[in-house]
Amino acid sequence: MNSAKVHEHASAGKDEKTREDTARIYARFAATFRSDTLPPAVARLTKQCILDTIGTTLAATTLAPEAPLFHDYVRDMGGKADCTLIGYGEKAPVQMAAFLNGCNSHMLDYDDLGSGHVSVATVPVALAVAEKCGGVSGSELLAAVAVGIDIHTRMYPYSTNEEWDINQRFSQTQCLGYFSGAAVAGRVARLPEDKLVNALGLAYQQVSGAHQRHLGMHAGWCGQGAVLATMLAQRGVPGVKDILDGRNGFFNVYMRNLTPDYERLTGELGKRFYTLEHHGFKAWPACGLNRRPISSILQLREEHGLKAQDIERIDVSGGQHILRLAEPLDARRRPTHSAQAKYSIPFTIAVAMVYGDVKLHNYTEAGMKDEAVLQLADRVWVHLDENPTREKEAALVQVRTRDGKVYQSQVKYPLGDDRRNPMSQTQIENKFRDCASFSKKPIAKAEIEQIIELIGNLDKLADVRKLTTLL
């Protein structure tokens, strides 16, 4: 790459002079998109995003070790309690609700995938602002989340041409979440186009987030920032200009290569939703890189009737990304913290082989002491493929039985992998039921079913507060 060409899109070329400001285009899209024109497939996927995000938020209230600390902080801050703290049976100011719910939604690393973690940056914001404003219909909430996710997906670097790539020192979820969150909040708060431009500008001034996993705070920070930007813009506070395209805009400050793909960024807004092309859900509550090894071991278990006690050893080979989930090996085989367990190939595929699934309870304190799992994890070995390519993210899993038989599998598209192997509606609902069972505020089975039904018919809901009262 010619470093001299970096940021050349900021120069005042002919196209630059005639191209409309991208932030204004997004603001207009968010402010004026008609909810009754949302394509059915997008509406269906957005409902799944909302259900899935609420579920992971509920589960974190008791399963995430750090959740009580965040909850205590929010309670201690006080303020006007008008927005639901999901899973607690309490309320807090809108900004604090967006923060805590955002953190919890992302804290278990069980939230959806695709163009970054888009739902945790948008759904908690939408619910908090809708409750704050009141009178927000389900169809409006649905449209707001769909618009925000689409903006986030369009801006997500890896879904554009290969020459446009975000500097990996920054979190895509958090950095882009300020913009998508502000678009969602502004839409729900009914801001006109000009004020939404200001909200995006105020959001940009807060953009941050090192690419280091930290207790779900990527989603909490951008959610809180998006609400703050929207509330200030609503009151008439101006935001900075040229926030995406300008010399000091996001593309120049946070991107490192050549011209952004403007056709992808703004083409066919409201008609083509990239969410449909770049979105998936996690079938298992583990690090995303564990999904392929899990799928492979489950496939071998089912096809050959394998049982843990019959296995002599399991070998997993892949690129450097796979090796990171196995070092140091002794600690990964016997994790002492849920995050360590989720990011462990030996422990996680041992769970999958022993039980034929991987569930939330497998990462609890009791689950990490499961002797059957630990004994098998001691027989799991992970190897570096000396010639790794991106395709080899599909790790090769080989099982050797005690009678000398060898079986292997290399699943490329695990369950939940966007369009290629999507989770069914029933699978997503069952995941929600499992998550909801861990809520700090107990939710009766009948209420869990009511939540599923309300979200499934969200476009018919007169006021979103009918949903939030159940959370």
Regions found by a protein language model. Give the residues of each.
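Hydrophobic face of alpha-helices
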Residues: 43, 47, 51, 122, ...
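Well-ordered alpha-helical segments within folded domains of soluble proteins
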Residues: 119-128, 177-182, 223-228, 290-292, ...
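Generic structural signal for well-ordered, non-membrane alpha-helices
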Residues: 24, 28, 52, 124, ...
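Function-dense linear segments that define catalytic or interfacial modules
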Residues: 91, 96-155
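Terminal-appendage/accessory-domain detector
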Residues: 1-115, 217-224, 231-471
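Glycine-rich, mobile lid/loop segments that gate access to catalytic sites or pores
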Residues: 131-228, 242-247
